[in-house]
Curated annotation (Swiss-Prot):
<keyword id="KW-0804">Transcription</keyword>
<dbReference type="GO" id="GO:0006939">
    <property type="term" value="P:smooth muscle contraction"/>
</dbReference>
<dbReference type="InterPro" id="IPR011993">
    <property type="entry name" value="PH-like_dom_sf"/>
</dbReference>
<keyword id="KW-0010">Activator</keyword>
<feature type="compositionally biased region" description="Polar residues">
    <location>
        <begin position="1"/>
        <end position="15"/>
    </location>
</feature>
<keyword id="KW-0678">Repressor</keyword>
<dbReference type="GO" id="GO:0007165">
    <property type="term" value="P:signal transduction"/>
</dbReference>
<dbReference type="Pfam" id="PF00640">
    <property type="entry name" value="PID"/>
</dbReference>
<keyword id="KW-0156">Chromatin regulator</keyword>
<feature type="compositionally biased region" description="Low complexity">
    <location>
        <begin position="287"/>
        <end position="299"/>
    </location>
</feature>
<dbReference type="GO" id="GO:0030027">
    <property type="term" value="C:lamellipodium"/>
</dbReference>
<feature type="region of interest" description="Disordered">
    <location>
        <begin position="131"/>
        <end position="254"/>
    </location>
</feature>
<dbReference type="GO" id="GO:0003682">
    <property type="term" value="F:chromatin binding"/>
</dbReference>
<dbReference type="InterPro" id="IPR006020">
    <property type="entry name" value="PTB/PI_dom"/>
</dbReference>
<feature type="compositionally biased region" description="Polar residues">
    <location>
        <begin position="223"/>
        <end position="234"/>
    </location>
</feature>
<feature type="modified residue" description="N6-acetyllysine">
    <location>
        <position position="204"/>
    </location>
</feature>
<feature type="modified residue" description="Phosphoserine">
    <location>
        <position position="517"/>
    </location>
</feature>
Length: 710
């Protein structure tokens, strides 16, 4: 016969007060955690004790039997006493305590089987009536004969004794020590208390908080299914003890990113979602608990707040006040790493001292100053500055100088200012280069004379600035390259603003001069709200040539006229007498400029060009212009390597101008002609009517159209 193990203290008290005072050899109280263990639900009375109670021969002595019963009862008392302190509902008993309690056991008298069964039946009924927290298990409420009880006890005695001994050994080795308490004070706790009893220990880690429910899942689930088959009114441990309720997770704005506050029966703790680590203290405070496992420390080092080697618990977060400081450093790294050379001040002294030594930098608000380092200059040709090629040529110069200047502090021989720290100032329509220490003016370049400027387009060249201008002494086109402390687009934007201002001032001055010569009485008031369209810049092509001069010719057209003029000039002059110049071809104007002085040698309107051709020599080119009534002039050029590009450009300009004239003439003919008088309209209508009548009658009279036209 198996003995029930789910009887509580209330059942035993009711049994002791409701009947005669009995001295029970077996304490029948069982803790709630024994109901969740599959191995303990079939705990049986030792076969030797049953044989002695039934009076069978060959049984053991009364003393050892009573000691066995008392030992089992005290073990159950210890398990019940420590149930509210064990988080995983494990039986808490050690071998040392078991050995220490054995000498204190007092021998009790043997009991008969019938008397023992009556006590068990009465206790089971009382436990069911009082509605215990765990479902009471009644073995049988029917009467059973002595023979049936003897057969069942004899068949199960040996197996139950072996299971009981193995179970006690496993529980003693795996459970923490617990102290027994009096029987009257043992009660099933209303809710399992995992981490709230007593002060919190720092040795609790994430495995304790997150692994409670999975530590004994198989045994717990199977045992509960067996115990609750007959009592559906009670809930399961999952229902009565919910660690994860909907309100358990809280997010707070005070917590750093990635942290969450969790509240459950164990208390309030903080969970770092990316790494999976937990801690009792808020993450924004001094340091984590001392119980952080080595695995948790290795996960914390992944965030990059410290080096990869090991740290002590007290030293790991010592130098890090918060999680925001490393983020600020991470934002600064891409900005400092954009340059290929080390980030350093462009002057030997720190920048604050340099600013103190340079008071004029910020005194005049009209001066824009930029700290730069000269990389030198590269000579350029006029062909490289042609439209569509200038940006590529300037970028090649930047690439050529910046890639070969690995050490910027080593000055190179060649041009002025090479490898030096300079101040680039934009003042009064002038670009100035000033020595930082002595404020000495090294170079001044009028902004209006700068041909091209640009910023490096390659990756890492955003701080390289270059401009192209003609040298005053050598008349050579030079591309000066600088490396700026700030992004070079600031200089380019400032230059663009200054050029726009200069062009606006010149436009206003030209309008003022023209306005003085106009009759103000004929001017029409224009409202100020009207927005005039911005003028479009025409495409200008420049070609470097030798200007042979111009001669008057008799006819405006003819290849023989051009060939005769070219032969006469080539035979009468030498190459040294030819003037180096360049021709600017625009859709409206052809301009001939001196290559060195940029003086205008000739300017011709495309609308007055009458004929153009290439001479017998492919290097020669000439065109004829109308200089006045019955006066024509032939301009001649020597081109390298041939005159094909120049002739095509002039021809394209002529065709474009001719097309514009046609467009303007067609619009004027449709919209600008005055309306015909009424008399002319009447004559035209009458003529149309007469013509219709004549066509009907088949008249073949000739029509005089000129007489009837207005």
């Amino acid at each position: 016969m198996s003995v029930p193990s789910s009887l509580s203290q209330s059942a035993i008290n009711a049994n002791s007060h409701g009947g005669p005072a009995l001295s029970l050899p077996l304490p029948l109280h069982a803790a709630h955690n024994q109901l969740l263990n599959a191995k303990l639900q079939a705990t049986a009375v030792g076969p030797k004790d049953l044989r002695s109670a039934m009076g069978e021969g060959g049984g053991p002595e009364p003393g050892p039997a009573n000691a066995k019963w008392l030992k089992e009862g005290q073990n159950q008392l210890r398990r019940a006493a420590t149930a509210h302190r064990d988080q995983n509902r494990n039986v808490t008993l050690t071998l040392a305590e078991e050995a220490s309690q054995e000498p204190e056991m007092a021998p009790l008298g043997p009991k008969g089987l019938i008397h023992l069964y009556s006590e068990l039946e009465l206790s089971a009924h009382n436990a069911a009536n009082r509605g215990l927290r765990g479902p009471g298990l009644i073995i049988s409420t029917q009467e059973q004969g002595p023979d049936e009880g003897e057969e069942k006890a004899a068949g199960e005695a040996e197996e139950e004794e072996e299971d009981d001994d193995d179970e006690e050994e496993e529980e003693d080795l795996s459970s923490p020590p617990g102290l027994p308490e009096p029987l009257e004070s043992v009660e099933a706790p209303p809710r399992p208390q995992a981490l709230t009893d007593g002060p919190r220990e720092h040795s609790k880690s994430a495995s304790l908080l997150f692994g409670m429910r999975n530590s004994a899942a198989s045994d717990e689930d199977s045992s509960w299914a067996t115990l609750s088959q007959g009592s559906p009114s009670y809930g399961s441990p999952e229902d009565t003890d919910s660690f994860w309720n909907p309100n358990a997770f809280e997010t707070d704005s005070d917590l750093p990113a990635g942290w969450m506050r969790v509240q459950d029966t164990s208390g309030t703790y903080y969970w770092h979602i990316p790494t999976g680590t937990t801690q009792w203290e808020p993450p924004g405070r001094a340091s984590p608990s001392q119980g952080s496992s080595p695995q948790e420390e290795s996960q914390l080092t992944w965030t990059g707040f410290a080096h990869g080697e090991g740290f002590e618990d007290g030293e790991f977060w010592k130098d890090e006040p918060s999680d925001e400081a490393p983020m600020e450093l991470g934002l600064k790294e891409p900005e400092e790493g954009t340059l290929t050379f080390p980030a350093q001040s462009l002057s030997p002294e720190p920048l604050p001292q340099e600013e103190e030594k340079l008071p004029p930098r910020n005194t005049n608000p009209g001066i824009k100053c930029f700290a730069v380092r000269s990389l030198g200059w590269v000579e350029m040709t006029e062909e490289e500055l042609a439209p569509g090629r200038s940006s590529v040529a300037v970028n090649n110069c930047i690439r050529q100088l910046s890639y070969h200047k690995n050490n910027l502090h080593d000055p190179m021989s060649g041009g002025w200012g090479e490898g030096k720290d300079l101040l680039l100032q934009l003042e009064d329509e002038t670009l100035k280069l000033v020595e930082p220490q002595s404020q000495a003016l090294l170079h001044a370049q009028p902004i209006i004379s700068i041909r091209v400027w640009g910023v490096g387009r390659d990756s890492g060249r955003e701080r390289d600035f270059a401009y192209v201008a003609r040298d005053k002494l050598t008349q050579m086109l030079k591309c000066h390259v600088f490396r700026c402390e700030a992004p070079a687009k600031n200089i380019a934007t400032s230059l663009h603003e200054i050029c726009s201002k200069i062009m606006a001032e010149r436009r206003n001055a030209r309008c003022l001069v023209n306005g003085l010569s106009l009759d103000h009485s004929k001017l029409v008031d224009v409202p100020f709200q009207v927005e005039f369209p911005a003028p479009k810049n025409e495409l200008v092509q420049k070609f470097q040539v030798y200007y042979l001069g111009n001669v008057p010719v008799a006819k405006p057209v003819g290849v023989d006229v051009i060939n005769g003029a070219l032969e006469s000039v080539l035979s009468s002059s030498s190459r040294e007498q030819w003037t180096p110049s360049h021709v600017s071809v625009a859709p409206a104007t052809l301009t001939i400029l001196h290559q060195q002085t940029e003086a205008v040698l000739g300017e011709c309107r495309v609308r007055f060009l009458s004929f153009l051709a290439v001479g017998r020599d492919v290097h020669t080119f000439a065109f004829i212009m109308a200089a006045g009534p019955a006066s024509f002039c032939c301009h001649m050029f020597w081109c390298e390597p041939n005159a094909a590009s120049l002739s095509e450009a002039v021809q394209a300009a002529c065709m474009l101008r001719y097309q514009k004239c046609l467009d303007a003439r067609s619009q004027a003919s449709t919209s600008c002609l005055p309306a015909p008088p009424a008399e002319s309209v009447a004559r035209r209508v009458g003529w149309t009517v007469r013509r219709g009548v004549q066509s009907l009658w088949g008249s073949l009279k000739p029509k005089r159209l000129g007489a009837h036209t207005p």
